[in-house]
């Protein structure tokens, strides 16, 4: 048993070292090209489109809000046009803005306004069930505004087809 543990530990150590060496080689190769990409990431914004007051270091301050985010994102994209902005989902449910989730798709449309390239669904995008999510997606699409691309997994494609939501979608197996 002891010998098996030692052999396993040795093999894992070698595998980790090889993995680190491969990573170092990739980073050096990327650095040689002179190309640089920045990635901005948000998640769990929960309908907080507006700023809100909170206590920071014992003082009340206005924090958050999509206007502040837009400023930071634009500044970063001005510094480096090769900036990718990703959102990890749960962009809805958390303020009264959620009450127009299905009819206005405010959160998803605002992510588009911010310049979000790609988002996904968190659990709160399903708070109004699949039909609410479908209504929100159709509303966002019908607005004609720029909305982020969506990446998802574990999707029932037959239900998506039935709801008419597969146009422009690609299933990767």
Show which residues each predicted segment covers.
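Cleavable N-terminal signal peptides
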Residues: 17, 26-28
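Bacterial N-terminal signal peptides that target proteins for export
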Residues: 1-11
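Hydrophobic core
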Residues: 12, 16-20
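N-terminal cationic leader/targeting segments used for protein routing and processing
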Residues: 6-7, 28-30
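RTX-like calcium-binding, glycine/aspartate-rich low-complexity repeat tracts
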Residues: 23
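Acidic, metal/ion-coordinating pockets
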Residues: 29-173
